[in-house]
């Protein structure tokens, strides 16, 4: 599974500005989903890869980013 890492509080994606390989996104994806996860900056959001099927990613149901 893949997807944008999401802030559970506000429903927003984790933003990033350095597209492609991005240490911040990799660190955040691994922190949330485990050290087997990958992560990079895609369309100014942190995109996580190699996730388990039940991983919660953006968008959150009934929670819009404000």
UniProtKB/Swiss-Prot annotation:
Q: Which InterPro entries match?
A: LCN-type_CS_alpha_beta_dom (IPR044062), Scorpion_toxin-like (IPR003614), Scorpion_toxin-like_sf (IPR036574), Scorpion_toxinL (IPR018218)
Q: Which GO terms describe its cellular component?
A: extracellular region
Keywords, in A-Z order: Amidation, Disulfide bond, Ion channel impairing toxin, Neurotoxin, Secreted, Toxin, Voltage-gated sodium channel impairing toxin
What positions are modified (Asparagine amide)? 66
Q: Name one GO biological process term.
A: defense response
Q: What is its main location?
A: secreted
- Got any disulfides in this one, which pairs? 12-65, 16-41, 25-46, 29-48
LCN-type CS-alpha/beta domain ranges (all copies): 1-66
Gene Ontology molecular function terms on file: sodium channel inhibitor activity; toxin activity
The source's domain of life comes to: Eukaryota
State the compartments where it is located: Secreted
Could you tell me in which tissues this protein is expressed?
Answer: Expressed by the venom gland.
Please indicate if the UniProt record lists Disulfide bond as a keyword.
Answer: yes
Additional notes on this entry: Is neutralized by the single-chain antibody variable fragment HV.
Q: Which family does it belong to?
A: Belongs to the long (4 C-C) scorpion toxin superfamily. Sodium channel inhibitor family. Beta subfamily.
Domain notes for this protein? Has the structural arrangement of an alpha-helix connected to antiparallel beta-sheets by disulfide bonds (CS-alpha/beta).
Any idea what job this protein has?
Answer: Beta toxins bind voltage-independently at site-4 of sodium channels (Nav) and shift the voltage of activation toward more negative potentials thereby affecting sodium channel activation and promoting spontaneous and repetitive firing. Lethal to mice.
| UniProt protein name | Beta-toxin Ct71
